[in-house]
Each structure stands twice: as C-alpha cells, then as structure tokens.
Amino acid sequence: MIADKSINLDTLYKVLFEDEKLELSEECIRKVEESFDFLQSFSSDKIIYGINTGFGPMAQYRIEDQSLIELQYNIIRSHSTGAGKPLPELYVKAAMIARLYTFLQGKSGVHMELVSLLSEFINRGICPFIPEHGSVGASGDLVQLAHIALTLIGEGEVFYQGKLRDAATVLRENGLNPFSMRIREGLSVTNGTSVMTGIGIVNLIYARKLLRWSVAASVMMNEIAASYDDFMAQALNEAKHHRGQREIAAMMREWVSGSQCVLQRENELYNQVHKEKIFEHKVQPYYSLRCVPQILGPIYDELENAEEVLINEINSACDNPIIDPETQNIYHGGNFHGDYISFEMDKLKIAVTKLTMLCERQINYLFHDRINGILPPFVNLGVLGLNYGLQASQFTATSTTAECQTLSNPMYVHSIPNNNDNQDIVSMGTNSALLAKTVIENSYQVMAIQFMGMAQAVDYLKIQKKLSPKSRQVYDEIRSFFPVFTNDTPKYKEIEAMIAYLKKENK
C-alpha cells in the first residue's frame, strides 16, 4: 500500500488489522528530503529552538556547536520516563503510523533514514515498549514518543514476535541499523500528538463496531419482545432532522428485514376490533427498546465527527517548530498541543458509555421476568431456584457499566500546569484517549453478556426460524461456540470468547 501525504480510516484499518504494508511514495520521499535540505542550509548561524537551544523552559540556554548532536540524544534518553503497564502493540503500531504521517508532511526537517526506519518498524511488526502513563498532551506525548525514539536509536525494548526484547538485538536480527542523529530528529520524534492520535484511531475503529453491534442487538431485542416496528419507520425518524437518528433507523430497518417476530401496528391495532380494557401486549415498549434511533443517533454523529478530527490530526504536522521549505522559513508555535484529540476522546467515551448504558438496560429487560413477561428470570433454562442462568453475569454488566459512567468525567478540563509553568495549560489528551480505551473495552464486556442472554432467550421462545436473516446468522454463529445451557457452569471463558467474536466480526 502506497503511503502518500494523507491516509484515511479504511487504509488505517487494513494496515492495523489486516497487516497491509506501507510503501513510501516518491513524492513523500522528495518532500522529506526537501525539508531536511532546507533545514540544513537555513539553520546555519541562526538561533532555532531545539537545534541549538535547550528544550522547554531550558530554551533560554544556548547549546554550543560541539554538543548539538548530544542534545538530540539527551531529549530521548531523559524523557524515557514512562510508568505503568505497556501500551498494547496494536495501539503502538497506530502511534508509529501517526508519527510517520507527520514526517510525510515534509515539515519536520528530519533525515530520510529516520522515516525509512520508522516505516520498517511498522511493516516488520517491531513495536516499541511504551508505558501507558507519562503524557500531559502538550508538547504532545513527549514521554511516550521518547520511548519510540529510544528504540529507533537502538536502545530500550521492543515487542517482537510475541516477546519483549532488547531493541538493539531485534534491529540486528532484521539487518537494520540504529538511527544516527543529524540535526533535530530527537526533538522531532518526541514532539507531537501521535500516541494519543494512534490510540484514538483504534478507539474509533472498535467504537464503530460497538455501534453496529448495538444496532443488531437492539433489533434482536425487539424481535424477542415482539415489538411493534413503527419506531423504526422512515417517516417517523425523518420527522426529526438529525442525520444520526435517520441513519440508525435505516440500519435497523435493513437488519430487521425479513423478520417474522416484530409486529406491524396497522395490522394489530388499527385494523382489528379490540374490546379488552387492559391490553396484554404493550402498546408501546420500554424506552430501551423503542427509543434506540434517538439514543444511538447522537452516538453515530459523534463517531463521524471523531473520524474527521482524528484523520485531520494524523495527516497534520504536529511538530514544533514547523520547517516550511515553501516559504523558506521556520515557525515556532504549538502544533503539538493535543486539545483536539483530548476533547474528541472525552466525547467518544461519553458516547460509548451511553451505548453501554443502553446495553445494560436491555440486559435488565431480558433478565427481569416481571418486566418482559415472556422469559424466565435471568433467562434461566434450568430448574428455577436450583439453577441460576445468567443471574450473576448481570452483576458484571452492572458494575462494568457503572465504571464507564465514572470514567466519563472529562480529562479535557483537568489541566495542571507543570514544566516550570512553561506548559501552563495542557490537554491531557493521552489520558483522555486511554480512558476512552478502557470504556470501550468495558462496553464489549457488557455487550458480550447481552448477546449470551439473547441467544438463550431465542432458544427458550423457539423463534430461531422467525428471526430476520441477519439475526439468524448471528444466532447461529454464536451457538457455534456458545451452546445452549441449562446447568450452572463458569461463564468467564464464554464471555471472553464472545468479546473476541464481537471484535472480529463486521455485521
């Protein structure tokens, strides 16, 4: 796959999840080389931040010529101070792709050898060890990116072929040489929003899958409940002028097509004589079943906006200073500041938390026999009192949803001045992205329990053949690894298997 100046979400998915390789285009190589050549000629006899000055609040100190290369190594080694568990390899790969595309803008003044080595890391599955904690998100992800830079110079550790190993050894085995500093590569690798952006990209991909599954689950819930189908109607949903609501309703109509489970109101209530004073079947189902387009619609809109922000960021020069050969100038500013990503990740985690809350309420409907009126408690297909069905799994779903609600407090407004008040207002963008990551992982856990419960409900009601073709396909796939059960057995492995299924499949 040719790496041009910009990348879209589809290409990112292929590189991240299908192991497509990136090949640098001739135009990108030309731009990188032009930027380096310009910096090399322009920087002579000038004071330029991070080339012949210290970093951050130390920028007031001039660095002597004989120490310029040492300076670039010093920022990498001094900032490799992360803590906590390692960021998973998928997210690290996304961060490296984000850094690569910053360099491909041709505004960083880095040597082409650095760009080539970074692309080799991506293509060969060499993933630097990056601790999760360390970034305040303004000067970007200095600490986490320093851990990437550390491995590019042959120091630190990398995950390679499933093992954590010395970077120098892995480079040697792959016939790769550690990068040697030229002008400002130490600063350029460490300075920017690439880690929070990489995490955000993976978050978005997984959140999109969650939304599709929530649509599927909501249709299946209404099939189980034998709901009236007019809440999905085009006329009803187009009466409200929000794209997301209309899209969700259309997705639901497509999914439910062919179902014999849902009812048509005109057939059941408009064209028949009803003399009963109290209707046995609910005229309008609970909000968690009926208001799905209105609940998931804003989430759809947020994911669309998140894509725009993330793709804009990954295709930007988030370095400082900006090296601009076109205007023959170098500009000092703050393109490393992560507020766009921080704000968007806060919104994303709020959206996914609301999706999780909908999922939890649908589980409650499914498990609560006095609410649904058609299923045994906790869809228990065994002996009531002796067996417990999925009773205890609701504890997991409820507690995990509660954690999502707590984690939805925003990081965007939690700025703490630091760095001798040089960084007196910061984004906390990586923290926001990491919290969104946790919320998304939690949501998959809750949704896994819902799909387990729905499969049990379908078996109890014996409606397999009445389901829509799409619902029947999902039911059959789930039953291939999660068979119907009546006796009490541990279910934690089944929950993990369901999560893996939900993350893998695209419906």
Question: Which residues are covered by each model-predicted region?
Answer:
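Glycine-rich, flexible loop motifs
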Residues: M1-D45, E70-P131, N222, A235-E238
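C-terminal auxiliary extensions adjacent to catalytic cores
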Residues: I2-K31, S35-F38, L68, T151-K507
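Exposed boundary/loop context
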Residues: S43, I47-Y49, C127-H133, E155, ...
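Hydrophobic alpha-helical context, especially transmembrane and signal-peptide helices
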Residues: S43-I47, G125-P131, L145, D166, ...
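FAD-binding core of FAD-dependent oxidoreductases
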Residues: Y49-I63, S67-L71, S78-Y101, P131-I153, ...
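Acidic, glycine-rich active-site loops and adjacent beta-strand->loop/helix elements
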Residues: F55, G82, Y101-T102, I122, ...
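Well-ordered mid-protein domain cores that form the structural environment of catalytic cofactors
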Residues: L104-C127, G134-L145, L150, G162-I183
